Amino acid sequence: MITISEAAQAHFVKLLSDQPEGTHIRVFVISPGTAQAECGVSYCPPDAVEADDTEIEFNGFNAMVDEKSAPFLEEATIDFVTDQLGSQLTLKAPNAKMRKVSDDASLSERIEYVIQSEINPQLASHGGNIMLVEITEDGIAVLQFGGGCNGCSMVDVTLKDGIEKQLLDMFPGELSGVKDVTEHQHGEHSYQ
């Protein structure tokens, strides 16, 4: 479920040594499955352990995960990185905003998962996003751009060289292309 690097484990052991005996860490997701999902790590005293928590054993401590957060923390990683600017704990949870779909899910569900977990986070740096409108009978993913992508002068390059290439590589034989149905209006909201 959650991978914690050796450096992060050592960091947690050190932090927990200053806490009352029996204190664990809790890894959680606030608003899981939404665009506003946020992950966190906190102390978990013994009296805060719930009956439906999942307990994951590590060397020197245990991590608690509440039942609601658990499916959204699949494939999550925690690391402790040190560089010339200092040290930082990082938590990456690719499924926090949307639960990972199974390999036998419908094509639209699998594409929607890739959009939410991989493509939209990249577009968010420009204030943009895309939404899957439909998949046509001939395998065309019909997409609509929003936010900073609406009216951006680079939208065609983003669509063909970025999004289409990525989706066709991931869904060979199932998807034949992508189409933008956005009524682009360049304005202050547009990235370029």
Swiss-Prot record:
GO annotations under biological process? iron-sulfur cluster assembly; protein maturation
Kindly list the positions annotated as binding [4Fe-4S] cluster: 149, 152
How is its cofactor bound, per UniProt?
Binds 1 [4Fe-4S] cluster per subunit. The cluster is presumably bound at the interface of two monomers.
Which keywords does the record carry? 4Fe-4S, Iron, Iron-sulfur, Metal-binding
**Cofactor list:** [4Fe-4S] cluster
Q: Which SUPFAM superfamilies match?
A: Fe-S cluster assembly (FSCA) domain-like, HesB-like domain
Iron listed as a keyword: yes
State the Gene3D superfamilies in the record: Fe-S cluster assembly (FSCA) (3.30.300.130), HesB-like domain (2.60.300.12)
Domain of life assignment: Bacteria
Among the GO molecular function terms of this UniProt record, one is:
iron ion binding
Q: Which family does it belong to?
A: Belongs to the NfuA family.
Family annotation (PANTHER family): FE_S BIOGENESIS PROTEIN NFUA (PTHR11178:SF51), IRON-SULFUR CLUSTER SCAFFOLD PROTEIN NFU-RELATED (PTHR11178)
NCBIfam families in UniProt? PRK11190.1 (NF008392), YhgI_GntY (TIGR03341)
Question: What protein is this chain from?
Answer: Fe/S biogenesis protein NfuA
Gene encoding this polypeptide? Answer: nfuA
